[in-house]
Amino acid sequence: MRVAVVGATGMVGEIMLQVLAERNFPVTELIPVASEKSVGKEIEWKGNTYKVVGLQTAVDMKPEIALFSAGGETSLEWAPKFAAVGTTVIDNSSAWRMDATKKLVVPEINASVLTKEDKIIANPNCSTIQMVMALAPLHAKYDIKRIVISTYQSITGTGVKAVRQLENEYAGIQDEMAYKYPIHRNAIPQCDSFEENGYTKEEMKLVRETQKILNDNTIAVTATAIRIPVVGGHSEAVNVQFENDFDVNEVRQILSNTPGVTVQDNLETYSYPMPIYAQGKDDVFVGRIRRDESQPNTINMWIVADNLRKGAATNTIQIAEYLVANNLV
């Protein structure tokens, strides 16, 4: 199968290539794609050397699948061009997520909505993916009424420039900054730009995407997204109010039985999720599970995942695997 990776030289693109190899995705021809400044560069993949090509060249090669991680503007312009030649596009940007004609997919939750006609498929936001992975099975059992979420997000979600800023600040070097403020020894209560309602785009993604993935616009969601000087993954403090009461041990059991979710919740051994543990792994880790004693039918939990893997690259490739396994591509 001919597979194009659009944004192959970027942070998520590199992880996509890594995950494709790890999961032995059936690639017969790899097409690494990037901006014009990277065309001609060579990358190594599974013992072979490939030259990076431009977008039009990749379209002309008519790959069966194109995995996009090149930003919204690139996706809006080029995803339809790939789709027009028969390529199925799986896009990591926010460009198509809230388009009513496009599917927003977390395979463990709603892959069954996909059909052969879906030529542009949206990958959800990283912070949304890890939250709904934990909440979807609980929604099915107890019916979620309201979610209050605060995120503590890795600088890797911003990209290479942000990682470089942290490394430079740690070393005492003044250089180009990805953020308006220092990130070393700091917490910045802004992820992405602000909308008119005072929330950031990142916060509103959590609201809108959660409702779309769970197929329930009655769920109330409010979010605060914070950038912290961590590289291993995103962490989330999540407070969930259900319509129905629950048993905490049953919640743990449901989560333990959910594919792609690992429960780390042993207070005696100080076992709970942390980015340093989640980094490089594909599971979503859930812990600090406890009843909210201030409000009926409400639970607190702490959710952590590697935002570059399950939050981006791995989820994208899992969608591609589903398409292949079900002859949808």
For the regions a language model picked out, list residue spans one by one.
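N-terminal Rossmann-like NAD(P) cofactor-binding subdomain of oxidoreductases
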Residues: 1-183, 218-220, 284-285, 289-295, ...
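Charged docking surfaces used in two-component/phosphorelay signaling
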Residues: 66, 155-329
